[in-house]
Amino acid sequence: MLLLDLMSSPSPQLLVAAAQQTLGMGKRRSPPQAICLHLAGEVLAVARGLKPAVLYDCNCAGASELQSYLEELKGLGFLTFGLHILEIGENSLIVSPEHVCQHLEQVLLGTIAFVDVSSCQRHPSVCSLDQLQDLKALVAEIITHLQGLQRDLSLAVSYSRLHSSDWNLCTVFGILLGYPVPYTFHLNQGDDNCLALTPLRVFTARISWLLGQPPILLYSFSVPESLFPGLRDILNTWEKDLRTRFRTQNDFADLSISSEIVTLPAVAL
């Protein structure tokens, strides 16, 4: 099993220190060691094109702290090219502008489907991006925004902000995180959805990284089991593409993709 060569890469101790010194300052509690190492693995996965973005939700550290964190990683020789901090609302995502633009351009070509889980429906239903014209325009807007940034990647870690007062952040984040079947719903009906007590097929993708450490959770998303047969082709294409991209890198090993069916009394999106 080929795992990270610790002789040519930063030690786990240095990766933990980089996170705790930059993301745990002031009143913020420093992330635990396991969280620090997992975050570093996710960031490396973004840099290597295995996922378009990572949503930072470890504590209340903001964009400036994340910039400092990524600068620390780069100073350790951990990142080979600049990443970008994209702030949407009160949320910060770490993205590779090149990779996320490629992903969003594929989204505009109809490579993913959406599941409408609006509370006004008795059951979830599949819809395409062409049925969600406002969302389609939003994806195009994000592409234009990120393409403008790519002209100035001389900065080690760049930062920008998108205004999102009327966005469905659940759907936008699902797209940016690379889910093949994001959930969507009508914002004027609140955050309720029709997924309660609905059997869901939960997909997880994991990769091995540091020897002796748990695998990195690369993806975790679900689709209603009743819609799975009609979504199988899209999910198979997503898996094939991920495996292809995985074979182009040598930082991670043992890509594992699995699924299980769960039923929950309520589902928060």
Swiss-Prot record:
Pfam families: DUF4504. Belongs to the UPF0739 family. This is UPF0739 protein C1orf74.
